[in-house]
Amino acid sequence: MITRNDVEYVANLARLTLTEEEIEKMTKELGAIIEFANKLSELNTEGIEPTAHVLNIYNVFRSDEVKPSYPREEILKNAPSHDDVCIKVPKIVE
């Protein structure tokens, strides 16, 4: 069970200033979350393999493929400053 003091303590750790209404609301909401987590711990998970993903699929990214890009001249013509090879940007690190 989450108490008002628990919410105030966590808010203080997070450097949050909560109103009275927010403290009451957070006490109820966090209490409901803890209650739900406790219900989950009652589930019989014997024989169920642990998993890191909900679905049994991995590496679903597309493969790397070289594709045509804009011509260098087209890109450089839109740059405020360039040296015919690269875009020049202001120096920001000494």
From Swiss-Prot:
UniProt keyword list: ATP-binding, Ligase, Nucleotide-binding, Protein biosynthesis
InterPro entries hit by this protein: Asp/Glu-ADT_sf_sub_c, GatC
Enzyme class: ligase
Pfam families assigned to the protein according to its UniProt record, in alphabetical order: GatC
GO MF: asparaginyl-tRNA synthase (glutamine-hydrolyzing) activity; ATP binding; glutaminyl-tRNA synthase (glutamine-hydrolyzing) activity
Gene Ontology process terms (BP): glutaminyl-tRNAGln biosynthesis via transamidation; regulation of translational fidelity; translation
EC number: 6.3.5.-
Signal sequence coordinates: none
HAMAP family noted in UniProt: GatC
Quaternary state and interactors: Heterotrimer of A, B and C subunits.
Family from the record: Belongs to the GatC family.
PANTHER family registered for this protein in UniProt: GLUTAMYL-TRNA(GLN) AMIDOTRANSFERASE SUBUNIT C, MITOCHONDRIAL (PTHR15004:SF0)
Role this protein plays: Allows the formation of correctly charged Asn-tRNA(Asn) or Gln-tRNA(Gln) through the transamidation of misacylated Asp-tRNA(Asn) or Glu-tRNA(Gln) in organisms which lack either or both of asparaginyl-tRNA or glutaminyl-tRNA synthetases. The reaction takes place in the presence of glutamine and ATP through an activated phospho-Asp-tRNA(Asn) or phospho-Glu-tRNA(Gln).
Protein name from the UniProt record: Aspartyl/glutamyl-tRNA(Asn/Gln) amidotransferase subunit C
Gene name of the record: gatC
